[in-house]
């Protein structure tokens, strides 16, 4: 039985519109915790002022009341969407009485109100034009930015600038309470030093402020702290603080990447991934490590034993999950391949294109659709055109793929390293057959060789043409010899354990164990 008032705190740093795997992992975890009624909080500590943080977190499916933001924590304003109206701002600041003139509106996010008498331009920024809501207002004097206000349902912060012509920078910021009083002031000296001034106390660094937040959170013995990201912010050593101040709560470390460098690891030494070195060497403070795949768990277990003579608890819990299995609404397109990833060099989509061109000579109605965006896009398009393959290989851009996979027969991956591979999980959840190399950890997790697809031998120093040849042979085999119906069934059965309800059970089990440890 879960303790009624326990909380799981998930520690992150920043969040943006385009998020990385860590934020997606947290978003899926939030779903799993909802499934089992566990109270979860997500702590962000970056200075996020470009957007209202509530817009960014809601975009990834978090509830506003799950968010703790360091800079908001010491105020009584809630994390909430931007509902403050432009009309309210204009009235409160008497812009009409002060003879401010609204400049011609260019349909952009920003409006300009100008007063010749006050030599001031006021620039409100729409959050949602149709609703008439704003999230920022900038004040400009003589073409110099002098201050900026930030709004959610009320004004929550203001930053003041030096106004220097050559080096205009923020001098201090005020963070407010709901009644408009100043909760605290952040002073900046331009050299990277900060001071946080409260009515009855000062904190002389962001690290001190963060420590104060941890103490005020007042962790209980049943609470759990999941440390997703640490020490990437130059002003903050949050990881060490959490190691020092997590008690009496239990500390859990998820591993979001390959955790060591195999090129520099042998029987005598291991080179840990530098994002995880601290967490692995301070294993005595860690109640459990969580990895996404059994394969990674086996490896980390043997390395901890060999190099640290340690036997820490390591659990496998997938970083992603499927709400439900997706069955095709109409028959899948015959001889169709799909791949989905960032269009980046390490995904080796060029190998997949070359392999498809070769296989197309045998399977004449073969098609490949490539989803995703990235820096390699134009190079990949050139490669398709050079091979006269525009009619059957297409770059499809960025799309929500939840209901797209089901239209295809087979998923193909060129990537040589996926920590987990969310797109692989989505593909088996839509019953596709799978083709990819036998590399850690994603392909080895989602491809059962000869059962739901082909897991191909791989050695780094083979030539590209050999790798492309292996992919091409697998494509041909998949569409000419394989029993695709049985491959599809096997993918669905493999996907079962990744259903949200089943992933939630694994969290439930881990949390239960930690509470009774």
Task: Label the model's feature ranges.
Residues 389, 483-498:
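A short, well-ordered alpha-helix in the C-terminal region of glycosyltransferases
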Residues 416:
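Aromatic "clamp/platform" in nucleotide-sugar-dependent glycosyltransferases that forms part
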Residues 433-437:
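Short hydrophobic beta-strand element within catalytic cores of glycosyltransferases
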Residues 379-398:
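Nucleotide-activated donor-binding/catalytic signature segment of Leloir-type glycosyltransferases, i.e.
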Residues 473, 477, 497-517:
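C-terminal alpha-helical cap of glycosyltransferases
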Residues 335, 342-358, 375-376:
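A conserved mid-protein helix/loop that constitutes part of the nucleotide-sugar donor-binding site
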Residues 272-277, 281-311:
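A short, active-site helix/loop in glycosyltransferases that binds the activated sugar's phosphate group
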């Amino acid at each position: 039985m879960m303790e009624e008032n326990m909380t799981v705190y998930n520690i992150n740093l920043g969040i943006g519109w385009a998020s990385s795997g860590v934020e997606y992992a947290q978003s899926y975890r939030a779903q799993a915790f909802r499934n089992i009624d566990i109270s979860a909080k997500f702590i962000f500590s970056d200075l996020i002022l470009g957007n209202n943080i509530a817009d960014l977190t809601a975009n990834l499916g978090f509830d506003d009341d799950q968010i703790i933001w360091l800079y908001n924590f010491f105020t009584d304003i809630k994390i909430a969407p931007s509902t403050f109206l432009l009309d309210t701002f204009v009235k409160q600041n008497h812009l009409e009485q002060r003879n401010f003139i609204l400049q011609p509106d260019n349909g952009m996010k920003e409006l300009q109100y100008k007063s010749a008498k006050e030599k001031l331009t006021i620039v409100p920024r729409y959050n949602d034009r149709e609703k008439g809501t704003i999230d920022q207002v900038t004040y400009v004097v003589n073409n110099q930015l002098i201050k900026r206000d930030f709004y959610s349902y009320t004004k929550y912060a203001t930053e003041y600038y030096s106004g220097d012509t050559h080096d205009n920078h923020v001098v201090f910021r005020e963070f407010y309470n709901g009644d408009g009083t100043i909760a605290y002031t952040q002073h900046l000296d331009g050299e990277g030093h900060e001071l946080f001034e409260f009515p009855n106390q000062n904190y002389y660094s962001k690290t001190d402020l963060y420590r104060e937040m941890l103490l005020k959170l007042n962790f209980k013995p049943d609470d759990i702290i999941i440390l997703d990201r640490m020490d990437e912010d130059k002003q903050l050593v949050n990881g060490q603080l959490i190691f020092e101040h997590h008690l009496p709560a239990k500390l859990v470390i998820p591993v979001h990447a390959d955790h060591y460098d195999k090129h520099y690891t042998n029987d005598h030494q291991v080179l840990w991934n530098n994002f995880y070195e601290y967490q692995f060497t301070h294993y005595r403070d860690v109640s459990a490590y969580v990895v996404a795949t059994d394969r990674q768990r086996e490896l980390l277990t043997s390395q901890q034993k060999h190099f640290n003579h340690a036997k820490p608890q390591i659990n496998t819990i997938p970083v992603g999950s499927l709400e439900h299995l997706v069955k095709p609404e109409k028959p899948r397109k015959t001889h169709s391949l799909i791949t989905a990833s960032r269009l980046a060099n390490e995904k080796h989509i060029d190998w997949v294109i070359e392999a498809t061109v070769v296989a197309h000579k045998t399977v004449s109605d073969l098609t490949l659709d490539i989803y995703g965006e990235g820096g390699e896009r134009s190079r990949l398009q050139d490669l398709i055109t050079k091979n006269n393959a525009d009619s059957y290989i297409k770059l499809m851009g960025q799309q929500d793929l939840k209901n797209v996979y089901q239209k295809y027969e087979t998923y193909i991956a060129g990537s040589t390293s996926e920590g987990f591979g969310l797109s692989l999980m989505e593909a088996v959840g839509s019953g596709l057959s799978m083709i990819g190399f036998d590399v850690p950890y994603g392909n080895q997790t989602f491809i059962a060789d000869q059962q739901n697809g082909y897991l191909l031998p791989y050695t780094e120093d083979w030539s590209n043409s050999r790798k492309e040849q292996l992919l091409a042979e697998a494509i041909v085999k998949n569409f000419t010899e394989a029993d695709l119906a049985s491959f599809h069934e096997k993918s669905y059965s493999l996907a079962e354990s990744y259903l949200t309800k089943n992933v939630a059970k694994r969290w439930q089990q881990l949390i239960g164990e930690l509470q009774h440890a």
